[in-house]
Curated annotation (Swiss-Prot):
Catalytic activity: glycyl-tRNA(Ala) + H2O = tRNA(Ala) + glycine + H(+); a D-aminoacyl-tRNA + H2O = a tRNA + a D-alpha-amino acid + H(+)
Name by which UniProt lists this protein: D-aminoacyl-tRNA deacylase
Source domain of life: Bacteria
EC category name: hydrolase
The keyword RNA-binding is assigned to this record: yes
Length: 144
């Protein structure tokens, strides 16, 4: 399971020109589900995302997590994160989970994050337009 997390001052996701998810200060989480992922990996990733210290403390050090700064989370499915780009000029998606499995784990991540912090989401498998203001910029690739 892969999460590309970005510390943002704002982010939103639109589907068919309608905003379906929007946050202020917090984390945009682009989530890629791979075929060997399961709820155990999802729980580990959720724990890491919610506790990863990427927000500045009073001394300006990255020492606080999204929960401590009372931020929000926007989770957007992104199957392209599971692409194999090692060969050729066209990505292979053979490492990606099946759509049913990916959607179930995506929904699980959104639900579990929402139990701890205000969480919003995109729409699984939709053509989405994501806009954000990356604060820093601060971006991390997390893989479980």
């Amino acid at each position: 399971m892969i999460a590309l997390i970005q510390r943002v001052s704002q982010a939103k996701v639109d589907v068919d020109k309608q905003t379906v998810g929007e946050i202020g200060h917090g984390l945009l989480v682009l989530l890629g589900v791979q075929k060997d992922d399961d709820h155990v990996k999802a729980d580990r990733l959720i724990e890491k995302v919610l506790n990863y210290r990427v927000f500045s403390d009073a001394e300006g050090k990255m020492n606080l997590n999204v929960q401590q700064v009372k931020g929000q989370v926007l989770v957007v499915s992104q199957f392209t994160l599971a692409a194999d780009t090692q060969k050729g000029l066209r990505p292979s998606f053979s490492r990606g989970a099946s759509p049913d499995m990916a959607e179930a784990l995506y929904d699980y991540v959104v639900k579990k994050c929402g139990e701890k912090i205000p969480t919003f989401s995109g729409q699984f498998a939709a053509d989405m337009q994501v806009s954000l203001t990356n604060d820093g910029p601060v971006t991390f690739w997390l893989e479980i």
